[in-house]
């Protein structure tokens, strides 16, 4: 009798732990992909900055700090404390929207040793992976009631004919914003993944 109870307990444990294992695997893939995108973003931005004069870098950085990224319209945690208090579904939802906002602008992201062909497909793969994680959640279907209303402009006048100075500024802004957003997504997915391990310390 005791042996039967033990066997049932082990079977029950195996069934209940399987979704967590699958979830951890999906999260690991998503985190790995966004880490790679973040590294690409850092590399492109660094290569672009190195092509500028010191004064140009200083002026562009000053302007960027006073400006906004297109994705700033996507409501997200304002600091690490709010990030840690946010639910997994909320972090996944924000990550999805951030990645989605770069699908069109990413076609213009390239520089030095990185081609645009390295970025757009990886963004699409990451978006698909995050969507799978959302759909795997019970409340996933309720996360996007207003998704059709979220239409972000493709970085304003970036695709218009600009003067040399304006073109330089827009390129700097685009690359800096991409790096910033990939860092956000990496942070959110890392925290969300950590939540799957009850004993883990998910502090930032």
Swiss-Prot record:
SUPFAM superfamilies: 4-helical cytokines. GO terms for molecular function: growth hormone activity; growth hormone receptor binding; metal ion binding. PROSITE patterns: SOMATOTROPIN_1 (PS00266), SOMATOTROPIN_2 (PS00338). This is Somatotropin. InterPro entries: 4_helix_cytokine-like_core, Somatotropin, Somatotropin/Prolactin, Somatotropin_CS. The modification Pyrrolidone carboxylic acid is found at residue 18. Belongs to the somatotropin/prolactin family. Residues 1-17 form the signal peptide. The lineage of its organism: Eukaryota, Metazoa, Chordata, Craniata, Vertebrata. GO terms for cellular component: extracellular space. Keywords: Disulfide bond, Hormone, Metal-binding, Pyrrolidone carboxylic acid, Secreted, Signal, Zinc. Disulfide bonds join 69-177, 194-202. Growth hormone plays an important role in growth control and involved in the regulation of several anabolic processes. GO terms for biological process: animal organ development; growth hormone receptor signaling pathway; positive regulation of growth; positive regulation of receptor signaling pathway via JAK-STAT; response to nutrient levels. The keyword Transit peptide does not apply. It comes from Perca flavescens (American yellow perch). It is found in: Secreted. Zn(2+) binds at residues 36, 186.
